[in-house]
């Protein structure tokens, strides 16, 4: 598949179309080799200290998310408390990286994580479908940033991407 565009169609960041050469190619999966490799890894013994370090790293990199239509500041407060202290019985467990909420709940999230080192992420660009017009998506991002989000999690219009309409994405 090839996307043909005029030279005037340049994406933000200076990316010109076509994008196909920049997109990863996924080849065929060798099911037998995959299963053999998985079985081999499952037999490996990981030392206790390495496991502990890996688990701590995983927690420190984790974002806790609530993206339901029924979200409230109270639910965000509970999520923030969990992110700050994932295991109340064990204060040595590190905090999570961030909590992710809808833009309108960013102020409540910021208030709850203030001073803890936990960041506030927000979804944008017409989550979850990504199928809104660009001006709506941009406004969505601007609003989340204005409310104080440290990080923006964006979604793309997967339908446009999968059908090769990369300029729309």
PLM-predicted stretches and their roles:
Residues 2-62:
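Charged, compositionally biased N-terminal leader segments and the immediate start
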Residues 10-15, 30-41, 95-100, 126-134, ...:
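Short, mixed-charge, low-aromatic patches
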Residues 20-31, 41-49, 65-76, 88-101:
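Metallocofactor- and cofactor-centric catalytic cores in central/energy metabolism, strongly enriched
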Residues 49-57, 70-94, 104-169:
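Alpha/beta enzyme core
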């Amino acid at each position: 598949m090839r996307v043909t565009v005029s030279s005037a169609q340049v994406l933000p960041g200076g990316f010109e179309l076509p994008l196909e050469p920049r997109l990863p190619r996924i080849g065929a999966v060798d099911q037998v080799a995959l299963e053999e490799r998985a079985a081999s890894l499952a037999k490996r013994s990981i030392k206790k200290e390495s496991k502990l370090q890996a688990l701590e790293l995983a927690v420190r990199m984790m974002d806790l998310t609530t993206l339901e239509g029924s979200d409230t500041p109270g639910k965000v407060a509970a999520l923030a408390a969990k992110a700050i202290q994932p295991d109340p019985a064990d204060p040595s467990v590190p905090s999570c990286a961030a909590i992710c909420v809808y833009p309108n709940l960013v102020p409540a999230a910021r208030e709850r994580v203030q001073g803890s080192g936990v960041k506030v992420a927000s979804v944008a660009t017409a989550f979850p479908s990504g199928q809104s017009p660009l001006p709506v998506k941009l406004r969505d991002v601007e609003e989340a940033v204005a409310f104080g989000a440290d990080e923006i999690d964006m979604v793309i219009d997967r339908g446009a991407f999968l059908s090769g309409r990369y300029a729309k994405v």
